[in-house]
């Protein structure tokens, strides 16, 4: 099967798998009622500046600020980060505790609309976090997934069909427990 057919099949499969994960993604400026997914960017200006810089460091500053100000999630470890054009993967530096969550923050730029996916891998076994039809306009997005839903993931693959630039950071976070 040629590469175009494989990518098309992979994109279709990712789209189908997305329905098993409905509700685990959100845009940075979208409200979400159940609180299971990370909070919005508290500082819109910081998010705009990060998008303008379009670097891992700028994205990480927004992620840390959001986590520190959310009161809902606490940063445990940074698992990895990368600036990506095309398909790529981020290998995790640590194993995530099953009681914690994977937390992916990203920003995206495209010259024309094209789909992309984030897929967790463990021993060659995939778990699609999200498939997007295109980038959101000038936004930062977050996705979280309880680690118990896909324990011991070793990497996050970025399946990027088209002319898409992404900056992606992956963290381990846990729910904040008020005493």
PLM features per residue range, with description:
Residues 93, 103-109:
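Short edge beta-strand/loop segments characteristic of extracellular beta-sandwich folds
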Residues 121-149:
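An anionic, turn-rich surface loop/hairpin at beta-sheet edges
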Residues 2-12:
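Bacterial N-terminal signal peptides that target proteins for export
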Residues 112-129, 170-171:
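Short, surface-exposed beta-strand/strand-loop-strand elements in extracellular ectodomains
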């Amino acid at each position: 099967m040629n590469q175009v057919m494989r990518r098309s099949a992979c994109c279709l499969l990712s789209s189908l798998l997305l329905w098993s994960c409905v509700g685990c993604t959100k845009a940075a400026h979208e409200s979400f009622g159940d609180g299971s997914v990370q909070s919005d960017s508290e500082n819109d200006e910081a998010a705009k500046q990060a998008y303008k810089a379009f670097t891992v460091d700028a994205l990480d500053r927004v992620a840390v600020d959001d986590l520190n100000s959310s009161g809902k999630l606490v940063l445990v470890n940074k698992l990895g980060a990368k600036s990506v054009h095309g398909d790529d993967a981020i290998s995790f530096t640590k194993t995530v505790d099953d009681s914690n969550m994977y937390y992916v923050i990203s920003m995206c730029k495209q010259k024309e609309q094209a789909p992309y996916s984030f897929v967790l891998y463990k021993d060659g076994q995939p778990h699609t976090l999200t498939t997007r039809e295109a980038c959101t306009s000038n936004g930062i997005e977050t996705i979280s997934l309880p680690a118990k839903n896909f324990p011991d993931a070793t990497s996050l693959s970025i399946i990027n069909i088209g002319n898409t630039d992404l900056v992606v950071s992956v963290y381990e976070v846990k729910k904040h427990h008020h005493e």
